[in-house]
Amino acid sequence: MDAVQELERRIVELEIQTALQEDVISGLNAMVAELRQTLDLQQAQLRLLYQKMQDRNPDAQEPYSLRDEIPPHY
């Protein structure tokens, strides 16, 4: 009878571990989905900013440089 109880205890422990892992996986999936939305939004914003910079000076022969934006006191 001792061996049966030990097996039952081990099965219960495995079930608990599985339930905890499923909870962690569910939380990670939610976080990945949220981060994907954030990334999509940031990519859209970056495309918009790039387009605005191109529209600002479409005839420029050289690419846009951040040095052009440095205030004069630097």
UniProtKB/Swiss-Prot annotation:
Belongs to the SlyX family. This is Protein SlyX homolog. InterPro entries: SlyX. NCBIfam families: PRK04325.1 (NF003316). Signal peptide: none annotated. Gene3D superfamilies: 1.20.5.300. It comes from the Bacteria. It comes from Neisseria gonorrhoeae (strain ATCC 700825 / FA 1090). Residues 54-74 are annotated as: Disordered.
